[in-house]
Amino acid sequence: DVFIDGVQLYEAPCRDQVFAPVRRTRVRDSWTGTTVPVEDPDVTELVWFAEVGAGAPTIWANFGRRAPASSLVEVSVRPTVFWPSEHHIDWITVRGFEMAHAATQWAPPTAHQQGLVGPNWAKGWIIEDNEIHHSKCVGVCLGKEGSSGDNYATLRRDKPGYQYQLESVFAARHIGWDKERIGSHVVRRNHIHDCGQAGVVGHLGCAFSRIEDNRIHNIALRREFWGHEIAGVKLHAPIDVTIARNVITDCSLGIWLDWETQGTRITRNVLAANCRDLFVEVSHGPYTVDHNVLASRASVEIASCGGAFVRNLIGGTGRLDPSMDRATPYHVPHSTQVAGFGFIPGGDDRWVGNLFFGGDADEAYAPDGWFGGRAHHGLEGYAPYPASWEQYMEGVGESATDHERYFGRKLPVYARSNVDLEGARPFDGEEGSAEIPGECALSVSVRAGGVDGPAGPDAALRLVVLRVALPGDFSGFRLPLPQVTDLERAYYADAEFEA
């Protein structure tokens, strides 16, 4: 990247655009199909382009009206800022730094993942009270090393990335991916912003970690990259990971948990002003989402089974996306040992004591986009799902062979004691839920700045102002406070909810 006085230029697609830059005020979000404002349109006219050949690279830059001779101009080339070159450099604390302007590489789960700062392949790091910003791709990386796979799908083109990702799980086990040697990191009270791919990323190496009290914003807003690895927090195999009390706003996607989301807890986070808030993909649980504010237009996307959503405030849509073309692993509880594989027929979700706001789903997803017409406010998207284990077993008994009985059969949904405000619609199988008509409103604002490290827990949450207007009839309704023992076991892992 190229910077002038700390301002990051845009990378131009060709040299001609350096001399005739195009000012942009809006950009299309490819996942939702919506167009969103560009944060600072004036900066879109500050651009650079590089030609790289056998000799020295040549860089052209347009600094607009800024004078480079009297300014601080930086070309970032370092792949990381704080990163061990060897594995198993354990128990390191990184505290109190400002770290910025790293030329980090794209970090998919099938590659050697690197970030501006991270432990490489190790255990027990604490990354706290730092400001981490303007990384080309990733801010904090808790991810995979290279011997278990390094972009083989791209280099060899013989098998899909999905297959290589499966292989990487077993390859990592052979080199010591377990609780005793890898993971258990803490990422807390950091101010992470303006990264091109993810604020925090990690495959395998993130297991057993805590990500808490961080302020994360302005992630992937330039839409320089397209891929399945982009979010404020993007984790694969977040086994027994806790994501707590973070404030995540102004990202293309807030939190994305992908593969092997098991024993994971997402609790007391505030997500707002994102194109999408929370996406849980091809996982089998058990995972818990509780006491969060999910206030963006697209609040929840579920392409998984085994979730428990408890006492959340959900201001936008929910979207369901079963996946019968990818079987992914689940594990022995609290372990990296693989217990089995399963597809994602949908269902096996629990929704207890949530508050749903209504709205226009076309504002969350463009009608002509990939997911237009497939999102709902409330739980009505579960309409074709059985509402109990008994209903599910009745359907199983009607078929002759195993394939007919089970393949693609939707799993039961357990929904109770939720509240649907004006415009939100319930699942027919809900128990003890309420629809409350009348005007309502929800807004979230966040004060500028980072987090105050010495303030301790909740430092990020203290930046938030939440305003809610509820109908008068709501005052008579009380949301339950269920215990984890009240939640039905996860189907595939056959495991209890413990978090």
Region locations from a protein language model:
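Solenoid scaffold repeats with emphasis on beta-solenoid/beta-helix
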Residues: H87, W91-I92, F97, T110, ...
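Extracellular polysaccharide-degrading/modifying enzymes targeting complex plant/algal/animal polysaccharides
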Residues: D1-W121, H133, C141, S148-W177, ...
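Extended amphipathic secondary-structure runs
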Residues: K179-I219, E224, G347-Y365, E404-E435, ...
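Short glycine/acidic-rich loop motifs that flank beta-strands on beta-rich extracellular proteins
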Residues: P79-V81, A103-P109, Q114-G115, K136-L142, ...
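Long amphipathic alpha-helical scaffold regions
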Residues: D150-S168, I216-H236, L271-G340
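Long hydrophobic segments that form regular secondary structure
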Residues: N246-I248, G254, T261-G263, T267-G306, ...
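Hydrophobic, small-residue-rich alpha-helical packing segments that form membrane-like cores
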Residues: S135-G232, H236-T242
